[in-house]
Amino acid sequence: MKLSEKWIRRETMLSPSVVFFYEKSEIPNSFGLETRRVDGTGVYAEIKGCGEGKTIILRADIDALPVEETNGCSFRNKNKGVMHACGHDAHTASLLLAAKILSKHRDEFKGTVKLCFQQAVEIGYGAMKFIKAGLVTGDRSFGIHLASNIPVGKVSATEGPNNASVDYFKITVKGRGAHVSTPEKGIDALFVASSIVV
């Protein structure tokens, strides 16, 4: 399949897939990149420059969300029950275009650029697959996210981490029983737990 700006924009927008079901949309390698599947649906590639240098990681999320798209736009997706509601199609298209440009100009930079098209971002699963495969070691790592509050044509950069993440944690609240006439001697675990939530 020939890679073009039109294909990137339309294919990623019109054919969204959720989490682990991205087998349908192929990330083409028509600009000389060998790609590797990561856990079935993620995609990894490397662009080598003209000599030894730093390793930079560029990452984009590729999943759609399980939300029905209800608009009547011409670019409405073809897959029922899912849509790129969080801009992941634009993230994917941006990384594909970066790959295309860097591939054409690899004789103008040194080092390696690693491309990570990450799956399962919304459930905190996909990144671990790239990490466990040893694919995200490097000197710097960059990712982007669209923001509707930033004017078109502008870019906002923040030092350090600035995106949300999926984190799992468990809290154990231990109570202590007491007689009903001396509640001050006990610990009401239900009250403590509800205070944490609120």
What is the predicted function of each stretch?
Residues L65-V67, C73-M83, A90, D107-V198:
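Histidine/acidic-residue-rich, glycine-tolerant segments that coordinate divalent metal ions
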Residues M1-H84, A93-F109:
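Acidic/His- and Gly-rich active-site-bordering loop/insert found
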